[in-house]
A protein has these predicted regions:
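Bacterial N-terminal signal peptides that target proteins for export
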Residues: 3-22
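Short non-domain terminal segments
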Residues: 5, 15, 27-28, 36, ...
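Bacterial N-terminal signal peptides
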Residues: 21-32
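A structural boundary/capping signal
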Residues: 33-240
Length: 240
């Protein structure tokens, strides 16, 4: 997938910007002074700045204003974005997570090339839930990062903090392709919301994904194989 190649290239170009201040664990993220290996397989190291990921920061720059402006506009899905939030906001937190996953998983997976005529386009939740007429009017669709982004912001609107949320880029070892999912820190573990998996599962019970990096609104984290030295500082280039 084009978006995975894009981010991998950025990851290599900006590896010099690493600094180890947080430990994010594939299964749970928590504060720590140094990085450790996850289950003997990965070190997870905080990286900054997120501005090196312009597609992600582009979403951040527009989505909150869009959601606030259109909070009362009824999108086609589930009676509308605002109605979904209203119906879900009184649920317990685990029910919120499950309902968010179920609701957005009901929307079709359609690659960006087919949906928008471009190889890679990251959509805001409102864009994702209001499909272009040239696909199927009234049917919502998007690719994996669109599902993950919509779930991220739905849970934020329901009261989850960004520290509890991670957009995760992984490699699907079964299919040999890149994939994007959402991780939610809940009950001392990381729950995975995935458009390819119907139910919500703890990350440590999903064996066919190789984590590459995680990102939220303030930081990103790289997964490095255990036993591999953290790359030394080096000159970095400019992101596209």
């Amino acid at each position: 997938m084009g978006w995975l190649k894009y981010f991998l290239r950025e990851l290599l170009e900006y590896v010099s910007l690493m600094r180890t201040t947080w430990l994010a664990v594939w299964g749970v993220f928590f504060l720590a002074g140094t990085s450790h290996a996850w289950d003997g397989q990965y070190q997870v190291i905080q990286q900054d700045p997120i501005e090196k990921f312009p597609k992600w920061t582009g979403i951040l720059g527009s989505v909150q204003a869009e959601l606030n402006k259109q909070a009362d506009i009824q999108a086609p899905f589930a009676g509308g974005w605002a109605e979904f939030i209203e119906k879900t906001k009184s649920d317990d937190r685990l029910a919120m997570i499950k309902k968010t996953n179920e609701t957005f998983n009901s929307m079709r997976y359609v690659p960006d090339q087919k949906n928008w005529g471009v190889p890679d386009l990251w959509n805001t939740p409102i864009q994702f839930t209001q499909s272009p007429d040239y696909i199927v009017p009234g049917r919502m669709s998007g690719d994996c990062e669109d599902h993950a982004i919509a779930k991220y912001y739905a849970l934020q609107r329901l009261g989850f903090t960004q520290d509890e949320l991670r957009v995760l880029v992984v490699k699907d070892l079964n299919l040999g392709v890149g994939h994007c999912i959402l991780g939610v820190i809940f009950g001392g573990q990381c729950l995975i919301l995935d458009n390819q998996i119907k139910s919500v599962w703890p990350a440590n019970q999903i064996q066919h994904y190789k984590p590459i990096y995680a990102i939220n609104e303030t930081h990103w984290w790289q997964f490095i194989p255990a036993g591999t030295a953290a790359p030394a500082a080096a000159a970095g280039g400019q992101a596209d």
